[in-house]
Amino acid sequence: MEKKPTMKSPLTRDQALELLKKYNKDPFHLRHGLTVEAVMRWFAKELGYGDEEEFWGQVGLLHDIDFELYPDEHCQKAPELLKDGGASDELIHGVVSHGYGQCCDVEPFHEMEKVLFAADELTGLIWSYALMREGKSAEGMEVSGLKKKFKDKKFAAGCSRDVIKEGAERLGWELTDLFDKTIKAMQASEKAVNEACGE
């Protein structure tokens, strides 16, 4: 079986970050982009795509590029903004696919796209839970505690449980496995994200 070519971005990481900042000023949105970038980089290495870590990371970093300025056209304005910034069609497809079934009809096919689809909403849930905990950190967080928050529909109500469940199904993972891996990814990157956010 012929090996698929490695996915690479024509952008450097600095260029991708500048592109995000061009359209996003809200510290919350910037933190979310940096968090999802770090989580995607962790998953790339964890799942055997280490040679594509930069690509996975940039897709995570830029996945909500249009949300701050165009919330009603989320994932619909992104292709234009990304194309103007020099992004490849492959990167654009990866970014847009995370909105499948909610704001676009671009389905996530590659494992990277499925991870983004699953982890995007889940990072928000984990972050909300972390803010409640001692030290406002994911450090020491356990799956059992996150499960309770997941079942409480009033907690972080903006984080779609249905999307998280569908994401796990698309990956062929148990929900518990997705929780465990994403918690570990956020724990591993928390310090770097905090520093990038000036904390």
Please provide the spans of the model-predicted regions:
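Acidic/His-rich, divalent-metal-binding segments that scaffold phosphate/diphosphate chemistry
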Residues: 2-70
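Electropositive phosphate-/nucleotide-binding environments in soluble metabolic enzymes
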Residues: 10-14, 30-34, 72, 109, ...
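A generic alpha-helix surface/boundary motif
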Residues: 14, 34-38, 75-77, 126, ...
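Divalent metal-dependent catalytic cores for phosphoryl transfer on phosphate-bearing substrates
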Residues: 49-155
